[in-house]
Amino acid sequence: MAKISVLGSGSWGLALALLLHNNGHEVLLWSARPENARKLREKRENPDRLPGVRLPDEIDVLTDLERALKDVDVTVLAVASPYIRSTAHKMASFVCRDQKIVNVAKGIEEKTLKTLSEVIEEEIPQGNVAVLSGPSHAEEVGRGLPTTCVISAHTQETAEYLQSIFMSPVFRVYTTPDILGVELGGALKNVIALAAGTADGLGYGDNTKAALITRGITEIGRLGKKMGAQMETFYGLSGIGDLIVTCASKHSRNRKAGYLIGQGYTMEEAMKEVQMVVEGVYSARAAREIAEKYEVEMPIITEVNRVLFERKSAAEAVMDLMLRDKKVETPMLPWENA
């Protein structure tokens, strides 16, 4: 049995705290907001984030970060991506050397263009940072529905240890050494999901969504390969797997925000309506800047940025994607008669 602290009392933090408790571990749950912590202690449920899922009495809900991190074996960082750096900064003085920190947020820091694990390592250099990602909506994990994810770490030993911590009959975990690929897949799929939701909002069909998913993973993989990630990762759980579920699921806040934009909402109105952090909005601009830095063509992500930040109409953005110059789908494959 391990002692585990889950930082963040949103839907994902609650779902993972319950999973880890059911796996037989001692679990602490930390909330940055005293009022949220008080309600969780009293009601043992967060009806706004994860209705119908009860938090066991054995899980202590804390607001004292030092106490939450004292003598723990693993820390699960389940705060939204815009708050990763500030939370990691607060954690730094309480984290012992080589303490395992599992980041489960998905995004890119807009100001620095760093992945979230890079941000955490910058703030907590003594930590041993890993990443858990994949097609895993909290609403389903919290209900115990079968889910499969991937965990990536700097060493095989750490990855396999964490794999054993999270594995259960309803939560299967694979391992990979490709931290960069796992993080890029998790962050950039949110931007593609905004596009897929926008297409739904415009009334387009399954053909359109399939095209966005397929060409979207091609864009993500193209950038990832240029940055040093492994192409194989993008065809796995943290790439195409996460992209499919985020583009198609009713639980996806990124798809929902995109849908509202397709219906005519502004970005600000859509984010307010969703009432949760829409990670794709924060990652979109960073993704475009990274693509420009590495000179990688990413037309879908470019058009998403134009809709979000330049007030381009969603219908016009789709039309511009359709009217791009003719391309070969598989440029690396030779023609027999060439």
Please describe what each predicted stretch is.
Residues 83, 94, 119-127, 146-232:
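Internal alpha-helical scaffold of NAD(P)-dependent oxidoreductase catalytic cores
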Residues 1-53, 60-63:
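NAD(P)+-binding Rossmann beta1-loop-alpha1 motif at the extreme N-terminus of oxidoreductases
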Residues 196-197, 225-235, 243-338:
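NAD(P)-dependent Rossmann-like dehydrogenase/reductase catalytic/cofactor-binding core
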Residues 55, 61-70, 74-146, 162:
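Rossmann-like NAD(P)(H) cofactor-binding subdomain of soluble oxidoreductases
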